[in-house]
Amino acid sequence: MKIDIGVDNKCGDFVTYMKDEAFNSQLHYISAISSFPISKMMELLPLSGNETIYESVNVLSSVDLSDLNRCIRSLYQRIIFSPLPKQSDANTDDSNNSNNANMQMETGKIKTDRHWICIEGIQTMFQYSQLKDPVEAHASLNDTMLRLRLLQNKCPSIEILFLLPPHEAPEFIQSLQEHDISRNNIPHRRQGKRFKRDNTGILIGDYIWKYYI
């Protein structure tokens, strides 16, 4: 699992990930604060000729941590326990699978599935959950994070990314700055600016970084 600060330029990363022909890539985008940046992505990757890629983008909405927990549980079932083909469709599925395998063999390599789960707006989800039930908010967060960790342990090819604005993870940013300073032997000067915590007293980006990543 990773944290990325700044969400404005992620479409380039999405396109690079989805265009990698060595894999059957799937992007799962979960957000509480915005819609998927489809227009920006289409500027980089036109829809015409790339329909299969866009069909592999799964956009989910999550208002609070309970919603997020349900989304992650659903993805867990989808990724780990993929349903077997129905018996009545066996011949058709076998034929399709054979054709797909032949096409992949012609390219010299059979593609494997991989998944990228991007979560945006975790602070907003936490705040909504805190307003309803603080105890349940922490329980939902813990269950979600443990399920994500279990999912990644079972499928190491899965990438999990939390997209955060800088003010939601100031301690994480400071750790990156201190790492760069120590690596480059630059004299360290502490910044005077302090980020304000939200009304729950918790910046969830820093919390996730400290206890789950």
From Swiss-Prot:
GO biological process: meiotic cell cycle; recombinational repair
Entry keyword annotation includes RNA-binding: no
Entries under InterPro entries matching the protein: Csm2, P-loop_NTPase
Protein's UniProt keywords contain Cytoplasm: yes
Keywords: Cytoplasm, DNA damage, DNA repair, Meiosis, Nucleus
Any one annotated GO CC term: cytoplasm
Subcellular location: Cytoplasm; Nucleus
Any one Pfam family match given in the protein's UniProt record, by short name: CSM2
Chief localisation class: cytoplasm
Protein's job: Involved in chromosome segregation during meiosis. Promotes efficient recombinational repair and functions in the protection of the genome from spontaneous and induced DNA damage like mutations and gross chromosomal rearrangements (GCRs).
Similarity field: Belongs to the CSM2 family.
Name assigned to this protein: Chromosome segregation in meiosis protein 2
